[in-house]
A protein has these predicted regions:
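Short acidic, gly/pro-rich beta-turn/loop elements at beta-sheet edges
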Residues: 33, 155, 176
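Residue-level signal for short amphipathic helical patches enriched in basic/charged
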Residues: 137-140, 157, 172
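Basic DNA-binding region of bZIP-type proteins
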Residues: 169-187
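Aromatic side chains
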Residues: 22, 154-155, 180
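Short linker/helix segments within small regulatory modules
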Residues: 156-163
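Short helix-coil boundary/hinge micro-motifs
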Residues: 1-144, 151, 188-189
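Residues immediately within or flanking Cys/His clusters that coordinate Zn2+
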Residues: 142-147, 163, 168, 174
Length: 189
């Protein structure tokens, strides 16, 4: 069963939305994971057209996917602070070095395309999207909710790029209530 991202989570524009969906294959709050086993990972990749029917995916491939996902989540967390997670960036660059990508030129266009199939091809497609988003400035808007119990990755559509929560009405409100209670208990003590 695929994880349903709450409708409150602002969706990134295509094709970055695919990367957002990939990172959101783990529901931190509910403890669910679409990539928990090879069959689930295969199903998710096929549903999202990242893995052909004939391509296989073993446990090592699943572990690689989870590592890429969690590296992207760490970078989305760093986007909250407009900082750099150097270790996550190094890890992503290591994955990118193994990603079989090629440049495809068209009339008035150029894009990165995968030069492989299977799990490495799927990772290459995701990293090509990250590359394009980093170039056009949309990557910095992909953020992980600051609520550690949530961590849905959302697209910060605010004009000044200061979005903090996947939803102000849910996670932002929870934070405000906790802060209020902490202030109140501190004043009572």
């Amino acid at each position: 069963m695929a994880i349903e991202v709450p409708t409150r989570v602002t969706q990134a524009p295509e094709p970055l939305r695919l990367v957002q969906r990939f990172v959101n294959t783990a529901d931190v709050e509910a403890g669910l994971d679409d990539l928990a086993d090879a069959a689930g990972a295969r199903r998710w990749l096929r549903e999202n057209r990242l893995l052909a029917r004939g391509d296989s995916l073993d446990e090592a491939g699943r572990e690689l996917l989870v590592d890429v996902r969690e590296t992207l989540r760490r970078l989305a967390r760093a986007n909250q602070e407009a900082s750099v997670d150097a270790a996550a960036l190094r890890a992503l660059n290591e994955h990118a070095a193994r990603a079989p990508l090629r440049v495809e030129l068209g009339p008035g266009s150029a894009e990165l395309a995968t030069a492989s199939t299977g799990v490495q091809g799927a990772i290459a497609q995701l990293l090509a999207i990250v590359f394009t988003a980093a170039r056009d400035g949309t990557w910095r808007r992909l953020k992980a909710c600051r609520n550690d119990a949530c961590e849905w990755v959302f697209y910060d559509a605010s004009r000044n790029r200061t979005g903090t929560w996947c939803s102000m009405a849910v996670c932002g409100n929870r934070h405000k209530v906790r802060a209020f209670r902490a202030r109140r208990s501190a004043s009572v003590a």
